[in-house]
């Protein structure tokens, strides 16, 4: 019900691109279906939509878990991507105009390109971009190609009441004490300025754990901070 007036406003020059943002896959599918219905109701309607999927979910690498970093030297879909993306984009743009996760994956396999990067590049050619909240609100993974500068964009935010919890997660940093221990072990034996700094940081974690443990009886176990829990590692 919200898509139609938003697209109508775009047709009247009130926006160049519509971003439909939701945290739920089912709602993304519903948005895809709504766009498809509008396109079917107006056979001559030139309307393209793409659904963006998180990189780890879209990845086609057969050993993705073994290669958490997206590196051309270990991924055949990333290696030479820019040499092959033009043909992949051309094949998609000659198609139906509705680009789901499955459609991107099929084309990515055909042309041996990264489906995640293909979706990002394709979004520049689409009228409607469907995806998660973080593509707009997360300071680390937001769509820089669109939001690093002002643009004539329209936004539909599904279930916006969920944004405060998501925003807290997006703007919060986490660091585990176990990371310090692993770094110190990696440095091996002997002294170094880096190992000294890691030792000092380790002491800060231990002090925080002690302070939280002492405060826990007063504030209740449910209120103990996440920092306290991670400091036990």
Segment roles from a protein language model:
Residues 6, 33-37, 65-67, 143-146, ...:
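Short, glycine/charged-enriched secondary-structure capping and boundary segments
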Residues 227-233:
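Conserved small/polar residues in nucleotide/adenosyl-binding loops
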Residues 116-121, 133-223:
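Signature of the SF2 helicase/ATPase Hel1-core->accessory helical subdomain module
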Residues 14-129, 137, 199, 206, ...:
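A substrate-engagement module of RecA-like helicase motors
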Residues 11-13, 41, 149, 160:
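Secondary-structure transition/capping motifs at alpha-helix termini
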Residues 2-13:
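Walker A/P-loop NTP-binding motif
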């Amino acid at each position: 019900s919200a898509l139609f007036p938003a697209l109508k406003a775009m047709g009247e020059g009130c926006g160049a691109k519509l971003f439909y943002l939701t945290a739920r896959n089912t709602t993304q599918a519903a948005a895809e279906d709504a766009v498809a219905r509008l396109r079917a109701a107006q056979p001559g309607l030139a309307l393209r939509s793409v659904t963006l999927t998180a990189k780890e979910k879209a990845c086609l690498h057969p050993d993705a878990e073994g290669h958490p970093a997206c590196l051309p030297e270990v991924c055949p879909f990333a290696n030479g991507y820019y040499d092959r993306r033009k043909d992949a984009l051309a094949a998609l743009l000659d198609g139906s105009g509705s680009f789901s996760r499955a459609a991107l994956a099929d084309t990515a396999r055909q042309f041996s390109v990264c489906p995640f990067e293909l979706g990002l590049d394709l979004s520049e050619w689409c009228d409607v971009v469907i995806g998660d909240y973080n593509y707009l609100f997360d300071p680390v993974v937001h769509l820089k190609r669109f939001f690093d500068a002002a643009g004539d964009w329209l936004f539909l935010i599904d279930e916006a009441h969920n944004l405060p919890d998501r925003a807290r997660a997006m703007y919060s940093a986490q660091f585990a004490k176990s990371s310090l221990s692993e770094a110190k072990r990696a440095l091996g034996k002997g002294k170094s300025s880096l190992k000294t700094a890691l030792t000092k940081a380790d002491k800060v974690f231990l002090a925080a754990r002690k302070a939280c443990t002492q405060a826990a009886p007063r504030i209740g176990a449910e209120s103990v901070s996440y920092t306290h829990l991670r400091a036990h590692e």
